Regions:
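Juxtamembrane helix-loop boundary signature in multi-pass membrane transporters
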Residues: 1-8, 99-160, 275-294
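Glycine-/small-residue-enriched transmembrane alpha-helix faces in small-molecule transporters
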Residues: 1-32, 144-171, 192
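Specific transmembrane alpha-helical segments of multi-pass solute transporters/efflux pumps
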Residues: 13, 17-18, 46-97, 133, ...
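Membrane-interface helix termini and inter-helical loops of multi-pass transporters
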Residues: 19-30, 86, 135-148, 198-212, ...
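Transmembrane alpha-helices of multi-pass small-molecule transport proteins
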Residues: 27-76, 103-104, 160-168, 183-202, ...
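Helix-helix packing/entry segments at the starts of transmembrane helices
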Residues: 34-36, 92-99, 168-191, 221-261
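C-terminal-most transmembrane helix of multi-pass membrane proteins
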Residues: 37-39, 137, 213-215, 249-294
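C-terminal transmembrane-helix exit sites in multi-pass transporters
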Residues: 44-53, 100-125, 253-273
């Protein structure tokens, strides 16, 4: 599968998840839904690996890296984003997540000594200006009585966790960790970390038997977790974390279109101006490092 197809498939697997997550909120605590999502995904992958008689034996050191990867990408990342969705319309956490491309570039510099160029810094600055414009009302009308600032902060924490997970996967890739078994163990460990968090909080393990909850959980577990991450991490293997992060740049556009259709989102002037600026900044960051996807 070539890079462009990997990019498109990943994009269309992930973009609807920002809206679908809304059906997970309500009766069941968001953290419990995260636990269910990745436990189900892990079980499905393990069944596949056992059926295919793939090797599932790894060293303690490898398991520790699986644990770190899973904690960052399949626990904390989603815990923060599920919680942010209780404060923000679904498209806005997706917009914040687009900054993952900037965090990935900086992470590559910090962890792998890849020094960012001047163009990288300019692109990152432009991207941040776009974010500020989009959320200008929330920024300039900051109030502790308004939950928006909490949602933004949680979305940024989720993005940072995702970027850190990308860096851990890049490290694991450099050490020849196999993709599918890595996903299986990382999702299992991530789900268990989330379960631990729920128990520390004293959260009750409830389940909602409505069609909307079960259908959204199935989509998020199978399409939004298994397939999306297989395609995304395969793309990361082929083109690097910086360019793979371009998925996070385009995703807000589709997420906003979905919110426009299903949540009656009105495109205000700050959104119309800020979103293209955000995309321009992120594209500048990517294009200066690696040639565009072909």
């Amino acid at each position: 599968m070539n890079n462009f197809i990997l990019f498109i498939v990943t994009l269309f697997c992930w973009s609807p998840t920002w809206y679908v997550i809304k059906f997970q909120l309500g009766y069941v605590d968001p953290l419990v839904s995260v636990f269910y999502r990745f436990l189900i995904a892990a079980i499905i992958i393990f069944v596949y690996l056992i059926y295919k008689k793939k090797n599932l034996m790894f060293s303690l050191n490898q398991h520790l890296w699986f644990l770190l990867f899973g904690t960052c990408l399949y626990s904390l990342n989603y815990v923060f984003f599920y919680l942010s969705n209780t404060y923000l319309i679904s498209a806005f956490p997706a917009v914040v997540f687009s900054t993952v491309v900037i965090m990935n570039i900086l992470g590559e510099h910090f962890y792998f000594k890849k020094k960012p160029s001047l163009k990288t810094l300019i692109g990152a600055t432009i991207g941040m200006i776009g974010i500020i414009i989009i959320f200008s009302d929330e920024i300039f009308n900051f109030s502790l009585a308004n939950g928006t600032h909490v949602g933004l902060f949680l979305a940024l924490l989720g993005t940072f966790s995702a970027s850190t997970g990308n860096m851990v996967y890049q490290r694991n890739l450099n050490n020849n960790f196999p993709l599918i078994p890595t996903l299986a163990y990382a999702m299992l460990y991530g789900s268990l970390v989330t379960l631990l968090i729920t128990q520390i909080k004293g959260t009750e393990l409830l389940f909602e038997y409505s069609l909307s909850y079960i259908a959204s959980l199935a989509y998020l577990s199978i399409v939004g977790s298994i397939f999306a991450f297989i395609f995304y991490l395969r793309l990361l293997e082929k083109v690097g974390a910086g360019r793979a992060g371009y998925v996070g740049v385009v995703m807000p556009v589709l997420a906003l279109l979905i919110s426009t259709v299903f949540e009656n989102l009105e495109w205000q002037q700050d959104l119309i101006i800020g979103l293209p600026i955000l995309i321009i900044g992120a594209v500048l960051v990517i294009n200066q490092k690696i040639k565009p996807i072909k």
